[in-house]
Each structure stands twice: as C-alpha cells, then as structure tokens.
C-alpha cells in the first residue's frame, strides 16, 4: 500500500513539535537519555536480533550480494558497538549554546553569536541499521528531532531499533517524537518527505551516488550531500617510495567499502620507473584489480585497460584506477575533472609541491603524506559523525555535532534604541 502524503506530513508535524522541546534541554538531560538508550539496546538485544534475522533472511532469498547482507546484519558485537557509540556521543561536548563569537558595540549593546539546533533533520539511508542509532544519537545530543528513512530491506530491524530508542527517550523525560521512522517503506514515503520544506529543515542522504543524486535533484527541502568518495592518491616526483607504497596500500586496501578509501592512483612519470613495479606487485598481491593506462599496462600486462568510467567510479571494492602523469599540473587537472570532492592525498618531500596541491584541490579534505582513510570524524578527533559532506554549504567534511547546528545572534542591552 502506498504511503500517503498526510501520514508523512503528520510525522513531520510531530517532529517539529518535539524539536521545540529538545532545543532548550540541558546537556545533562540529553546525556541521560543517550545513556538510557545505550542500556536499552543491550537489554532488548534478543528482540533486535530476531527482527534483523527476518531482514537478512529476506535479503538472502532475494539474491542480495553477500557484501550487502553483511552491511544489513546485526550481531551481539555490533549492537554493543552501537550502544558504545551512544555512550561516546554522551561524552562529547554539547555544541548548543556555545558562543561562537561576541563583541560589545560602542553603544554598550552586547552581541553574541550562539549555536542553536537546526530543528528537524531527515536522514535517508540504505541498508546499514546501525545508522538508525548513530543518527538518532547525534541528533538528540545536538537538540534536533530526527526523521529516519532507512532501506526497506532493514525495515524490521529499524522498527525495533526506533521503538527501543523512543521508549528510552520517554523514560528519560524526552519527547518520543524526537526520534521517528518515516511511515512506509515505498518510494512514495521518500518523495513526500522531500516535499516538506518548512517542516523539515534539512535532508541528509547517506548511501550511493544514485541515492544522493536523486535526493538532491528531487527535494525541495535543503540537502547536505554526503559520502560519495572518488578519492585520489598522487605520488609526486619527489616522493619517498616506501612512504608512497605504504600510503597507497593503506588508502586502497585497509577497508575498501568506505567512502574515504582511495579509488585512483596517479604517479608522476619521473618516479614511475622506480615506483610502478613495486606498487603494482603489492596491489596485485593484496587482491586488487588494477585498471591501468598504457604506461601501467606496459609494466603489468595483467592490468585491465582503464576507461573514463573507471576514472569516475567509486569502486568500494578491490579495484583501483592507476595512471601516469607528466607533472603536478596534469595530476591536478585530472583530479579537478574526476574527483567527487571528498579527499585527495599527495605523497611528496617537496614543500612547494605540497602547498600547491593543497591550494589547488577543491575537496573537503586534502592530505599531505597521509592516507585518505583519515577523513573521518573520530580519526579527526571530532567524535562521531553523521557523514562526510562533499558540498560547500552548510558544512564540509566530517559532520559532527557542531555541523548539526546553526547560529543565532543574541543582543543583550539595557533599553538600547536605534
């Protein structure tokens, strides 16, 4: 049965009301709720696992790939990790009420720019049920209400998870409707959510390029784009070969199914004779399929011929596009053409080259002699994140608690008049 626009709108209205109750809450109240949610996840883990078993069984019956089934699967260890994530969010500083800057005007009026919640945040995501808990925790801590629209393949899991979170919220004195699952599992529910400008303050899609593109193109609600990571490693002519080899392997193979893994390796022609044989052998030994240009294939004939589609692809697998460039300028031109704006890395001993690379890469993060895998809220020391924003407004890079707030100007006077 198709989900009605009225049902989705009613949920958003309730979320808007809950947001008004969440915004002024103290840190102590929000932290108590998060800790209660963590305990409730563990207390009801058997119920969560039973619901998840229904989802994974249906996915296998539908012929879903093993990788996607793994993303969908919950285990006692993964539930413990979700609970631990909530405890970690509770330990983070509360951004709400932080004074970003302030001044006293010549007439004595005191001005402060203060962080405030965004309001109602809609999260549209795919098969990972852990996102349900992660997103809810971050939104609650930052004083926002959240509307969660996960994949239909995880519907049973998400229903139980949201029920657990809502009950724990109420037990801690928070409004239940601060955390809601968007009604329905059909595409209509997503379309209705994307039309609720004025009730929903922002949508954050988490998933593949197709999902993000559809939300950006169809939504009337403001969207923060996250996640698509066609990340590059450029090995400069002045690179240390051992360092370049280690960074390339880490960026590509440490965890392939994440947005900050490297998908393209560019090698300066001046170091190719020394570096290519070593890196191609190491990639092959790690199980990576290399998609190479003519120079690469002359060194390793087993490499697959690279295409424009390869240069544009976020593989999320043991595949890597590899090419040789004649200069730093050519590497930068390639990155400007094909990058998704997530993370780029340069390996070099040249300070001038590194500065030029940093200044010229228009991406959310740029690494110098470090792996692309560092682009992550926790690795940046920011704590948990809701995603990696690859756009320039309203946030860019890892989106932690401060990025889930806006600001308001507060003027404190004593009968001041203009």
From Swiss-Prot:
It catalyses: L-glutamate 5-semialdehyde + phosphate + NADP(+) = L-glutamyl 5-phosphate + NADPH + H(+). It comes from the Bacteria. Its EC number is 1.2.1.41. GO terms for cellular component: cytoplasm. CDD domains: ALDH_F18-19_ProA-GPR. Its main location: cytoplasm. PROSITE patterns: PROA. Disulfide bonds: none annotated. It is found in: Cytoplasm. HAMAP family: ProA. Belongs to the gamma-glutamyl phosphate reductase family. This is Gamma-glutamyl phosphate reductase. It comes from Parafrankia sp. (strain EAN1pec). The gene is proA.
């Amino acid at each position: 049965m198709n989900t009605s626009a009225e049902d989705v709108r009613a949920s958003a209205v309730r979320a808007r009301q809950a947001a008004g109750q969440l915004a002024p809450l103290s840190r102590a109240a929000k932290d108590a709720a998060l800790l209660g949610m963590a305990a409730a996840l563990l207390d009801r883990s058997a119920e969560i696992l039973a619901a998840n078993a229904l989802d994974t069984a249906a996915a296998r019956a539908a012929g879903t790939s093993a990788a996607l089934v793994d993303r969908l699967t919950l285990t006692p260890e993964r539930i413990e990790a979700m609970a631990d994530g909530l405890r970690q969010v509770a330990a983070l500083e509360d951004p709400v009420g932080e004074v970003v800057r302030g001044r006293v005007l010549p007439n004595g009026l005191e001005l402060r720019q203060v962080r405030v919640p965004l309001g109602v945040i809609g999260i549209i995501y795919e098969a990972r049920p852990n996102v349900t808990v992660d997103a809810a925790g971050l939104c609650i801590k930052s004083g926002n209400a959240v509307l969660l629209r996960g994949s239909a393949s995880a519907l049973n899991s998400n229903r139980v998870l949201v029920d657990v979170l809502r009950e724990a919220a109420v037990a801690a004195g928070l409004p239940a409707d601060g955390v809601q699952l968007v009604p329905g599992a059909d595409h209509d529910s997503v379309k209705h959510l994307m039309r609720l400008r004025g009730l929903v303050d922002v949508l954050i899609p988490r998933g593949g390029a197709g999902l993000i593109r559809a939300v950006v193109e169809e939504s009337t609600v403001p969207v923060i784009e996250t996640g698509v990571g066609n990340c590059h490693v450029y090995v400069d002519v002045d690179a240390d070969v051992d360092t370049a080899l280690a960074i390339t392997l880490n960026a590509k193979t440490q965890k392939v199914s994440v947005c900050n893994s490297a998908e393209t390796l560019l090698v300066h022609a001046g170091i190719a004779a020394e570096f290519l044989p070593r890196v191609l052998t190491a990639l092959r030994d790690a199980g990576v399929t290399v998609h190479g240009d003519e120079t690469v294939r002359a060194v390793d004939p087993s490499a697959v011929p690279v295409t424009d589609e390869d240069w544009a692809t976020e593989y999320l697998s043991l595949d890597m596009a590899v090419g040789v460039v004649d200069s730093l300028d050519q590497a930068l031109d390639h990155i400007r053409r094909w990058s998704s704006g997530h993370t780029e890395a340069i390996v070099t001993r040249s300070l001038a080259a590194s500065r030029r690379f940093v200044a010229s890469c228009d991406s959310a993060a740029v690494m110098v002699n470090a792996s692309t895998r560092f682009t992550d809220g926790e690795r940046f020391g920011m704590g948990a994140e809701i995603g990696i924003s690859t756009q320039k407004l309203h946030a860019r890079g890892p989106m932690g608690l401060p990025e889930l707030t806006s600001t308001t100007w507060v003027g404190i006077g004593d009968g001041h008049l203009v």
